C-alpha cells in the first residue's frame, strides 16, 4: 500500500534534475553556512519496498516498515531532519545544503510549512500540499514532463550539495521544507550585514 511513498522524487531525478547546481564551492560571499539534509534509511528494506534499487543509497538503520510506523505514530520519522534547523546569518552570506543521508530531499523555500508533494505521505499525515508543489517543466525532459519546482530547482540528492545564493536570502525569516518529507523544516533568519 505504501510502496510508492518515496518513489516520485527519484523519477524526477532520472528525468533531468541532474542539471541542478551540485557540489558548488564557496562563492565570494563573506561566509558560507552548512546545513545537512539527514536521514537514516536502511537500503535493503527501502529499495525492496519501493521496487527501486536507488531509492536509498545510504548506510542507515531505519527500515522502511519502521519509518512508516514512526510516521503514523509521531507524524515524523526520527533522523530525517535538517541540521541545524535554525540558522541566523547576515545578508551577503550563503548556505550550502549537503545531502548526507541515503534518500533524495529538497530544500525548498515555502511561504508556510505544510504538506509536501508526495500524495501518499500527505494522506498518511492528513496534510495539504504547499503551493510550492505546483509542477514546472523538467529541463531536458521529453514530452512536457513536469515535476514540483522543488524537485527541479532545490534538489539535495545523496552526496550532493545545493547552494542557496546570497541573493535569495534577503533580510527577514525564510522557511525551508523538504517537499518529500514535509516534517523536515528549517528557519533561516537573515539580518543586515555589518558595515
Predicted regions mapped to residue ranges:
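Bacterial N-terminal signal peptides
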Residues: 8-18
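Extracytoplasmic copper-binding redox domains, predominantly the cupredoxin/blue-copper superfamily
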Residues: 19-195
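Bacterial N-terminal signal peptides that target proteins for export
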Residues: 1-8
